[in-house]
Amino acid sequence: MLKLFSAFRKNKIWDFNGGIHPPEMKTQSNGTPLRQVPLAQRFVIPLKQHIGAEGELCVSVGDNVLRGQPLTRGRGKMLPVHAPTSGTVTAIAPHSTAHPSALAELSVIIDADGEDCWIPRDGWADYRSRSREELIERIHQFGVAGLGGAGFPTGVKLQGGGDKIETLIINAAECEPYITADDRLMQDCAAQVVEGIRILAHILQPREILIGIEDNKPQAISMLRAVLADSHDISLRVIPTKYPSGGAKQLTYILTGKQVPHGGRSSDIGVLMQNVGTAYAVKRAVIDGEPITERVVTLTGEAIARPGNVWARLGTPVRHLLNDAGFCPSADQMVIMGGPLMGFTLPWLDVPVVKITNCLLAPSANELGEPQEEQSCIRCSACADACPADLLPQQLYWFSKGQQHDKATTHNIADCIECGACAWVCPSNIPLVQYFRQEKAEIAAIRQEEKRAAEAKARFEARQARLEREKAARLERHKSAAVQPAAKDKDAIAAALARVKEKQAQATQPIVIKAGERPDNSAIIAAREARKAQARAKQAELQQTNDAATVADPRKTAVEAAIARAKARKLEQQQANAEPEQQVDPRKAAVEAAIARAKARKLEQQQANAEPEEQVDPRKAAVEAAIARAKARKLEQQQANAEPEEQIDPRKAAVEAAIARAKARKLEQQQQANAEPEEQVDPRKAAVEAAIARAKARKLEQQQQANAEPEEQVDPRKAAVEAAIARAKARKLEQQQANAEPEEQIDPRKAAVAAAIARAQAKKAAQQKVVNED
């Protein structure tokens, strides 16, 4: 009795809620054996034919490749793709792929050479001697992925299962009403399928192996039973036909009675599921050493003349397969990749066959009926009754349409397997699956953005923490550097402080004068001398600063000198071209000569105070001096040739002479105050200039005496008064100069010139006095 009960439990199956029973159309294609399709002229191999990232390219344009040669490298979850035939790589560019929107993905385009040569194949017939890791790596590098429709890398799936897998389930249900690829594969290659199952069992070491197959495949069931006749480790479970019993969660519940938790995987409950086609691909990869380059594809529909199942090379254009099967398209012909419930309509027929392509359906206009117009939801709950995942499709529809992503997530939209049962039974013809696909894509995009934001935040926080640690370490180093001085340093500091205090005490001690002793004033004298020296140094610095600020630019000075020379030449030409009647006023000439001499002295001082770097060209200086002497001689000649009728008023001349002396004294004082103590005067030059000035003064007096009119008389008393005033002013000036500070130096040249002028004026006054007495 106990054995009977155990046997009953062993073969027990469960039933899931919901599901539908659409009309079956499998007989269109499952009656003919598998056949090969002629090679296409061009193959388009997308680099991404699986869930995950695309691999790294290992070929380039112009390379010759063989069948089975890797086109990409598989690292991590990146699954490699292989050349479906031998030929030449003509392009590597984006190309539209098997997607509802025909999205362009990077693809390798190969022109076949028609030879279909394989790479050297190394099979592992003794795979049981290989380790688990070696087998998983070989399966991964040979490009094996889930061929049931998901496209998940098989090697990654086996690696993730680990040692916690207790039940291995082989999915042979194939519940779509048109698809017969697995059915025909089990009929024609049952032994190879079972061998692939044994390889998977060797890797996972499960306690039980279950094959789930629907009862609408009698030929496949009989072939499997024949192969498993002597096997006791693999159980074949025949289940009732119900859509979608081929779903992973639904088949797991049917065979084990266990439900996969929301948001979880079947491996969480110790179950791992593989497709029949995947098992066959594993066998070819491990034992035969052949990468996956082809798969079984169902060609069905009333628009195809020769429906059936074919071995289609990956990368073959869909148009090539349909034309080989006798495709007769209508005006508004549609082609569906996949079944009528879970498939999608191809936007055009040049997309390639990929690893997840299991069916190409070309229905006629009457086969699927006219598309119905979408209407409003009537809340009939028929979709909820048909949902195999126990969801509320009508609520998910409203949430998806209203962009309420949080509520859609709360209502477990991620558990939707997109089987299309809800849309099949909907009386309002609402394409619910399309809404759910779009909502899940938007939620995935939001989650990805949140993930990137979280990663960015983590990086920012890590950076802030690192900066804080560096700051704390830096402060700690500063604190450790600011330690107390050593004992010897303390002694040195104390000694220095003692010396400072001693000096301060000595400075503040009063000076005591004892009777009979002279006081020691050396400290006071030294302090006074130091203060004087400091004051002189400050005054010298201030004087240097003022001199540097007032130094003329040598270039500007040269320009001004050139302009003055040009004006002088122009004046000479005008004077030379003047009429003989036009005479020169001696007073104006004397004034101009005095102004010219003053400007010359000022220019000499500016040049003397210029920076030592700027040097004066001696040749230019000599030329300018010669020009000045020539101008002076010419002026003297003009004065000598003046008309005798024009006379000079002695009183006006005396007044002008007094004004000139006052201006000269003021200019001398300014020049003495601004003069550098370093400037020295050559006594010989001063004597020469004084002699020249005296000679000119005598000559001028003689001219004035000769030109003076006898009729004009000068008052002797006024002249005597003016002479006395001049002598008094001269004495006062001498006293002021004698009382000046010893630091101020008098320019000998200026003094000589002033003395000569004074003597000339005195002589002139005396001569005028003698003339008046006569």
UniProtKB/Swiss-Prot annotation:
[4Fe-4S] cluster 2 binds at C387, C416, C419, C422. Its EC number is 7.-.-.-. It is an enzyme of class 7 (translocase). It is a peripheral membrane protein. Its main location: membrane. It comes from the Bacteria. InterPro entries: 4Fe4S_Fe-S-bd, 4Fe4S_Fe_S_CS, Ion_transpt_RnfC/RsxC, Nuo51_FMN-bd, Nuo51_FMN-bd_sf, RnfC_N, Soluble_ligand-bd. One of its GO terms (cellular component) is plasma membrane. Binds 2 [4Fe-4S] clusters per subunit. Keywords: 4Fe-4S, Cell inner membrane, Cell membrane, Electron transport, Iron, Iron-sulfur, Membrane, Metal-binding, Repeat, Translocase, Transport. The keyword Transit peptide does not apply. One of its GO terms (molecular function) is 4 iron, 4 sulfur cluster binding. Its cofactor is [4Fe-4S] cluster. Residues 602-750 are annotated as: Disordered. Residues 369-397, 407-436 form the 4Fe-4S ferredoxin-type domain. Transmembrane segments: none annotated. It is found in: Cell inner membrane. [4Fe-4S] cluster 1 binds at C377, C380, C383, C426. The complex is composed of six subunits: RsxA, RsxB, RsxC, RsxD, RsxE and RsxG. Part of a membrane-bound complex that couples electron transfer with translocation of ions across the membrane. Required to maintain the reduced state of SoxR. Belongs to the 4Fe4S bacterial-type ferredoxin family. RnfC subfamily. HAMAP family: RsxC_RnfC. This is Ion-translocating oxidoreductase complex subunit C. It comes from Escherichia coli O6:K15:H31 (strain 536 / UPEC). The gene is rsxC.
